[in-house]
Amino acid sequence: MKVKIGLKCSDCEDINYSTTKNAKTNTEKLELKKFCPRENKHTLHKEIKLKS
């Protein structure tokens, strides 16, 4: 079952990316280093739930 998630910047708290993930196979929270346009650098982005 795919669920919609957002990736929130840990520095500026903006939700910069949205994607889907398989909730059955990936139970842990997703953490990725992605580019933050507000900070203009690569920062850690953590998974949050989006309203679907």
Swiss-Prot record:
GO terms for biological process: translation. GO terms for molecular function: structural constituent of ribosome. Keywords: Ribonucleoprotein, Ribosomal protein. It holds the Pfam family Ribosomal_L33. InterPro entries: Ribosomal_bL33 (IPR001705), Ribosomal_bL33_CS (IPR018264), Ribosomal_bL33_sf (IPR038584), Ribosomal_zn-bd (IPR011332). The keyword Methyltransferase does not apply. GO terms for cellular component: cytoplasm; ribonucleoprotein complex; ribosome. Belongs to the bacterial ribosomal protein bL33 family. HAMAP family: Ribosomal_bL33. This is Large ribosomal subunit protein bL33. It comes from Helicobacter pylori (strain ATCC 700392 / 26695). The lineage of its organism: Bacteria, Pseudomonadati, Campylobacterota, Epsilonproteobacteria, Campylobacterales. The gene is rpmG.
